[in-house]
């Protein structure tokens, strides 16, 4: 049987904004102790698949581009509109996509100055998607964590440090064993200052790496809160009932399990 080897594009143009983003060597220094994993390896979560055979092949290899779903124009307009939720007084929002949102949320829960975290879906073309919808790979959504933070106690730079250390931003549409556009790397900003800081950080990080970063930097779009089951998943114990600390400043390794 002959196997067709397809050389994937370096990046999916539709998935990226202006400059690409980057990361320091320290960001890739993950613990090797088991059962700790830097990004989800065995999450038991559905892998995104596309409907056409060729797209399915690319997606399984982790090189797919954003899916082209047939969405109602009015639905897409809402989904691609700005996040109209309002943070608490004196607080700011930021959204981050860095693979499976369970572990990413716990990492941000531990940051002093972060006052609230929620996991959800954004940057898709379907209004009110479910987890199952997103996992088909046809809605365009990314799994994200929306962070509410007090800028007097927590800088946007410190949130970016967590972002870089939590995942590998040089892998397109995948983190570890999780494959699909819903696991893509992304920074979604709410202010011009956040955008500036993110782009400057990317330029600095990219100078250190020997791989090109594929993180997208885009304005935050409408945030769809994920089902309650997914909220604070690891802090609640997950499927295995093994709770992990969300205490501020906690340095315990984050164990990934579904």
Curated annotation (Swiss-Prot):
One GO biological process term is: response to light stimulus
Entry annotated with the keyword Transferase: no
What switches on its expression?
By light in etiolated seedlings (at protein level).
Report the transit peptide positions. 1-53
Task: Tell me what reaction this enzyme catalyses.
Answer: L-methionyl-[protein] + [thioredoxin]-disulfide + H2O = L-methionyl-(S)-S-oxide-[protein] + [thioredoxin]-dithiol; [thioredoxin]-disulfide + L-methionine + H2O = L-methionine (S)-S-oxide + [thioredoxin]-dithiol
Location of the protein in the cell: Plastid, Chloroplast stroma
The Gene Ontology CC terms held by the record are: chloroplast; chloroplast envelope; chloroplast stroma; cytosol; mitochondrion
A Pfam family it matches: PMSR
UniProt modified residues of type Phosphoserine: 245
Region of interest called Disordered, as start-end residue ranges on this chain:
62-89
The entry's note on the tissues where this protein occurs is: Expressed in rosette and cauline leaves, and at lower levels in stems and flowers (at protein level).
The keyword Oxidoreductase belongs to this UniProt entry's keyword annotation: yes
Q: Which residues carry this modification: N-acetylmethionine?
A: 54
Task: Extract the GO molecular function terms from the UniProt entry.
Answer: L-methionine:thioredoxin-disulfide S-oxidoreductase activity; peptide-methionine (S)-S-oxide reductase activity
Give the record's keywords alphabetically: Acetylation, Chloroplast, Oxidoreductase, Phosphoprotein, Plastid, Transit peptide
Give the enzyme's EC designation: 1.8.4.11
Spell out the disulfide connections: none
User: How does activity shift as pH rises or falls?
Assistant: Optimum pH is 8.0.
Q: What does this protein do?
A: Catalyzes the reduction of methionine sulfoxide (MetSO) to methionine in proteins. Plays a protective role against oxidative stress by restoring activity to proteins that have been inactivated by methionine oxidation. Prevents the methionine sulfoxidation of the heat shock protein HSP21 and its subsequent inactivation. MSRA family specifically reduces the MetSO S-enantiomer.
Q: Which NCBIfam families match?
A: msrA
Q: Which family does the record assign?
A: Belongs to the MsrA Met sulfoxide reductase family.
The protein, known as? Peptide methionine sulfoxide reductase A4, chloroplastic
